[in-house]
Amino acid sequence: MASANFIRQFELGNDSFSYQKRPEDEPSQPLSNRNINKLNDSSTLKDSSSRIFINSQVLRDGRPVELYAVECSGMKYMELSCGDNVALRRCPDSYFNISQILRLAGTSSSENAKELDDIIESGDYENVDSKHPQIDGVWVPYDRAISIAKRYGVYEILQPLISFNLDLFPKFSKQQQIESSSISKNLNTSSFNTRSPLRNHNFSNPSKSSKNGVHTINNMQSSPSPSSSFLLPLTQIDSQNVKRSNNYLSTSPPILEQRLKRHRIDVSDEDLHPSSQLNDNEASSLFPDTPRLNHSLSFVSLVSSLPPLDQNIMQDYHTSKDILTSIFLDVNFADSSALEAKLSDSLDLDVPIDELGHAALHWAAAVAKMPLLQALIHKGANPLRGNLTGETALMRSVLVTNHLNQNSFGDLLDLLYASLPCTDRAGRTVVHHICLTAGIKGRGSASRYYLETLLNWAKKHASGNNGYMLKDFINYLNHQDKNGDTALNIAARIGNKNIVEVLMQAGASAYIPNRAGLSVANFGIFVENALKQPEDSKQTKVSLMSENLSSKEKTAVPPRQKSRDIIASVTDVISSLDKDFQDEMAAKQSMIDSAYTQLRESTKKLSDLREQLHVSETQRTLFLELRQRCKNLMTSIEEQKSELSNLYESFDPNGIHDSLSLDADAPFTVNENNNKNLSIAELKFQVAAYERNEARLNELANKLWQRNSNIKSKCRRVVSLCTGVDESRVDSLLESLLQAVESDGQQGEVDMGRVAGFLRVVKEHQA
């Protein structure tokens, strides 16, 4: 195995996992149990280092977790203590001692060996061998340590160590060491049962000033040490402060400018700088009376938002979710005291309350419920927590217009400013989200309000005391997402000229291309005096495109490398860059040609559809016309029927008969003495009327005759069947039969029911 020689130098125990250098005089002798126990007994740096207590938490299972700032041989560490186990994080590069993490996880020897093989195979590790056994071992980068901690289920235990803001590392003095030891002892004996759950693991408590609980920054004074100027004096830390501590301002470690593959480094006291000392005057100068942000804010390196909490590893998940959800159903959001009373310390405020991973803070920020936001932040909700896509509560708030309607975005920034350096899964900041939302219909004014408020807030608070300057924020505006797009590129692509103007006036660069090589000028957005090409634009573009190379392609150059090797390396990089650029341009050109072809086809289809739409609209108009005509005709018919009904009711046929005294059976005669001479047309009209009446009468007579013939035939058959006489002889015998029936009884005494029944039987027999 590739790591065989490496493994021989270390002992992998079942109960402990430590890397210890073998004595030179006994290269093949394994570590004895006594030596291992000695190493475990001295698992902290108490005897050989300066330690300052930071804070303490209680895990869900009741175990206490303590966080210390440690300085050993001039090197700064953060130490997390959990029972008999410790875990160290090195401050300059955020490397973790992986042996301590595995010992904390209680892994077996086989698991330790497998993990060690993977680390050695990757090559991204550092083997430290010094006179301090607590520091010896294999150190791995931040990302890999996080991955291992999650895989072995100790991520939540290490959360205070992982999320601690290294910019807040304290400076050491003898007085602070004495005070920290006293406070640690008091907290260990009296405060464990009253502290918040593990999610609250910061040592600072936001001070209450101004209406939002955030200091303003007018007349701010400069400080030589921005990182240390936000540490509370250790004498002010008590159990109540620890209970109310918030973890939301602890950020991930800064990204290293150079991450080399380091293997074996020997550390000695002579190679490290002595620790800094802080006198009483300097300690008192850490907190001038000038108002400032409660915690420093750095835009030097951006970090990804925290993922949503996993409900499978959470206790009382459903209880926390139900209580937090019920708060949003309460219409009385203005009562902050009532809200804080509902938010008990046992609740997990970061629990997802919907299927998209949104926490209560996301919803409160989106619906602009400021009292609820203040209560959540005061109780320890983490604004760095994202949803399933990595969107923080601040990002979600700019997707709606509620804060524009209430003019409350400035107050929201005072509460959630700690999440400004966070990015989502696509690498986008809140400025990216503002520009993306500006492309939605009706959201342009809201996006401009959010952007201008954010820029004014950043300008107002830019100070060394707050951890950042305006140039850092301008670099933040120029941050590129995973597609290489800056916020200005997105605003130009969606065509919002107002957002483009605001960003460029704030100092955003218009010459940063995305991965496709497109910048602001390529999107057809032109702002006066803004897109003037600088003289060194070519060099700028080359440098910007070079920065888009992934970190894996960057090669670490030894300090004593010869100049010709450097030139050859640079030439290779430029050649590779040019080849990649040409290949990418060819691929993009092919995509553009394909897009043009699809565009032409889509245009033709659109023309055909428009023609069909025109025909359909014409037919629809005609149909509506015809329907209206039909409606008019039906109305006219109803009116005519109504008039006819009225005439029929007023018609008196008896009056006509009486006046005329006509006999219906009288023959038609022509009055020859009629003095009125009718015209030929009138006579023809009367003749035609008589002919029509005659035709109708003839037709009616024929129908009656045919019907009577059928009836006669049926009756003849009935009589034939009843009398047993041939049907052809019935007519001749009918008179005799009639006399016989009449003589059978008196007139009117014939049983017609029997006759009807008899006729029915005859009919069925015929069928």
From Swiss-Prot:
Compositional bias (Polar residues): 29-44, 192-221
Nuclear localization signal, short sequence motif: residues: 261-264
InterPro entries: Ankyrin_rpt (IPR002110), Ankyrin_rpt-contain_sf (IPR036770), HTH_APSES_sf (IPR036887), KilA/APSES_HTH (IPR018004), SWI6-like (IPR051642), Tscrpt_reg_HTH_APSES-type (IPR003163)
Modified residues (Phosphoserine): S252
Annotated GO CC locations: chromatin; cytoplasm; MBF transcription complex; nucleus
Compartment annotation: Nucleus
Keyword Metal-binding: no
Entry function: Major component of the cell cycle transcription factor complex MBF (MCB binding factor, also known as DSC1), that controls G1-S phase specific gene expression. Involved in the control of rRNA production, via interaction with pol5. May be involved in the transcriptional regulation of the cdc22 and cdt1 genes. In fission yeast, two genes, cdc10 and cdc2, are required for the cell cycle control called start, the point early in the G1 phase at which cells become committed to the mitotic cycle.
Quaternary state and interactors: DSC1 contains cdc10 and sct1/res1. Interacts with pol5.
Protein name per UniProt: Start control protein cdc10
Annotated organism of origin: Schizosaccharomyces pombe (strain 972 / ATCC 24843)
Gene of this entry: cdc10
